[in-house]
Regions:
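Short, flexible, basic/aromatic active-site loop/helix in glycosyltransferases
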Residues: 160-180
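Glycine-rich, basic loop-to-helix element that forms the pyrophosphate-binding segment
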Residues: 93-109
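A conserved acidic beta->alpha catalytic loop
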Residues: 65-76
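Conserved donor NDP-sugar-binding/catalytic core segment of glycosyltransferases
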Residues: 126-162
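Short, acidic, metal-binding catalytic loop of nucleotide-sugar glycosyltransferases
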Residues: 49-58
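N-proximal low-complexity "stem/linker" segments adjacent to membrane-targeting elements
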Residues: 1-50
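Short aromatic/hydrophobic "clamp" motif used to bind/position activated sugar donors
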Residues: 114
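The conserved acidic donor/metal-binding loop of glycosyltransferases
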Residues: 118-122, 151
Length: 180
């Protein structure tokens, strides 16, 4: 199964969004909430690269860092990426557990929509573009646009070879309540 669009599709999305900012790209801003805790450099860089490499500029990355003193490299790496991308917001916080740390990331958000991502995730290059377009389509049809979700894949060594694919069904509130 193909998990990512063809290269030419991604290039077309990038061309459509070239030179545009989060304000003028026409897509709603999505704040990606991510609590950080002692994140290994490899995973942190892969995650940050996946945000910086999005095909659309409609994202804001909100990072709440509860790493301990032995992992000061987390802050250093994030600050390095902030130099490249003004849409990365960072705050050092006291560790209060994943739920409270995620809420701390939410306090940094200014987007119309919130998305959740773990510190060892990799965002598909078209994730924010696709979500933004889906929101616009729902609005155009006059349908509620308050909740979106996506499929996911789990990887071990290479993002080219998924270990597990989790294809989620169409929206079904009863199913959602049973699983969460």
């Amino acid at each position: 199964a193909r998990y990512l669009p063809a290269k030419k599709v991604l290039e077309a999305q990038r061309a459509e969004m070239a030179g545009k900012t989060a304000v003028d790209c026409g897509l709603p801003t999505i704040s990606v909430l991510t609590p950080l805790y002692n994140t290994p450099e490899k995973y942190l860089r892969e995650f940050l690269d996946s945000f910086v490499g999005q095909t659309a500029p409609n994202g804001q990355l909100c990072l709440a860092d509860a790493s301990d003193a032995a992992h000061g490299d987390v802050e250093r790496i994030v600050k390095e990426y902030q130099q490249k991308n003004q849409q990365i917001v960072y705050k050092k916080i006291e560790n209060k557990g994943i739920a409270a740390n995620t809420n701390a990331a939410a306090q940094l958000a200014t987007g119309e929509y919130l998305a959740l991502a773990d510190h060892d995730d990799i965002l598909a290059p078209h994730a924010l573009y696709t979500m933004g377009k889906a929101i616009l389509q729902l609005r155009q049809r006059g349908e509620p646009d308050g909740f979106l979700y996506s499929d996911e894949a789990l990887f071990t060594k290479s993002i080219r070879r998924p270990m597990v694919a989790h294809f989620k069904p169409d929206y079904a509130p009863d199913y959602l309540l049973c699983c969460n």
